[in-house]
């Protein structure tokens, strides 16, 4: 039995589906009164990351835990009570229950010195997990295609508007598809090499956002105009809190060598063209 925490979220659902495809029994942790329904054919454990007793019940009889739990964009949760205290509680409950392996979803940007609170807390939880003496795998994915491309490209392009990019948009990033991260998370449960390791994960290529726009042009068969703004200026259709994050992508490159991980875990990586074609086709359907 494998417990998935965060299973009603986008990434968690994909991980659950991957595990079920492999023929595994899956239990999912669902908050009391949650409106989000988990995938059918899973066992449901009702509980909360701040309820230690419920976590111990959820971990009973489980050999591995995969967690994607993180503070949501809505509601009253905070980084401190979900990402920090909640994950601490989960690690402690898994240890007490004799869980053999815990897979934790962090981020490539995790650092205890980061100016971003979430990235600082992710790094703290990584340290707690390493010091716990539990067998573990830490996943450090790069930025998600599924988050950034719809927000920065599709919101404008699919409505016939110019895509607004920050600066020259020449920095290169190995964006990763959620489905690929889900495949790595599931594979880590069964791969001995994953134990007590940190997997830095990205897509097959480091690309610029201009490259991404070009991929959508190829997928849709028509040009997409681009306009540029200075860092900090408004980006039409994009929430204001994201403007600074979008600008930060123009401050560094984040290539991720993937040959070794791709071969070790048997994951076929999604290219920007693969992703754009699927998104354009879904919109046209």
Task: Describe each PLM feature range.
Residues 1-39, 45-46, 50-53, 57-60, ...:
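Oxidoreductase cofactor-interface core, primarily capturing Rossmann-like NAD(P)-dependent enzymes
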Residues 85, 176, 207, 267-270:
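Conserved active-site and cofactor/substrate-binding residues in soluble primary-metabolism enzymes
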Residues 50, 81-86:
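Glycine-rich NAD(P)-binding loop of the Rossmann-fold in SDR/ketoreductase-type enzymes
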Residues 59, 63-66, 83, 103:
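N-terminal Rossmann-like NAD(P) cofactor-binding module of classical short-chain dehydrogenase/reductase
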Residues 68-69, 106:
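Glycine-rich, N-terminal phosphate-binding loop of Rossmann-like dinucleotide-binding domains
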Residues 70-74, 259-262:
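Short glycine/proline- and acidic residue-enriched helix-loop micro-motifs
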Residues 219-220, 231-285:
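A hydrophobic C-terminal alpha-helical subdomain
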Residues 86-89, 93:
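Short, conserved SAM-binding segment of the class I
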């Amino acid at each position: 039995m494998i417990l998935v925490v965060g299973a009603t979220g986008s990434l968690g659902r994909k991980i659950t589906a991957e595990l079920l495809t492999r023929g595994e029994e899956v239990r999912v942790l669902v908050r009391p009164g949650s409106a989000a329904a988990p995938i059918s054919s899973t066992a449901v454990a009702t509980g909360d990351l701040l309820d230690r007793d419920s976590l111990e019940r959820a971990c009973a009889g489980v050999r591995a835990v995969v967690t994607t739990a993180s503070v949501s964009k809505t509601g009253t949760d905070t980084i401190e009570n979900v990402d920090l205290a909640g994950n601490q509680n989960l690690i402690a409950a898994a240890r007490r229950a004799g869980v053999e392996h815990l897979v934790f979803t962090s981020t490539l940007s995790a650092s205890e010195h980061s100016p971003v609170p979430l990235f600082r807390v992710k790094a703290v939880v990584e340290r707690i997990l390493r010091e716990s003496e539990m067998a573990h795998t830490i996943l450090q994915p790069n930025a998600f295609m599924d988050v950034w491309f719809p927000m920065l490209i599709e919101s404008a392009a699919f409505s016939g508007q110019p895509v607004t990019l920050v600066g020259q948009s020449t920095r290169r990033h190995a964006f990763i598809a959620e489905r690929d991260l889900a495949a790595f998370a599931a594979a880590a449960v069964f791969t001995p090499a994953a134990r007590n390791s940190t997997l830095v994960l990205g897509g097959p290529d480091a690309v610029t956002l201009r490259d991404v726009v070009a991929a959508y042009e190829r997928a849709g068969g028509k040009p997409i105009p681009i306009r540029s703004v200075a860092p900090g200026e408004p980006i039409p259709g994009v929430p204001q809190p994201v403007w600074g994050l979008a600008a930060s992508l123009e401050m560094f490159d984040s290539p991720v060598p993937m040959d070794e991980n791709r071969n070790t875990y048997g994951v076929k990586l999604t290219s920007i063209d693969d992703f754009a074609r699927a998104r354009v086709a879904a919109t046209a359907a």
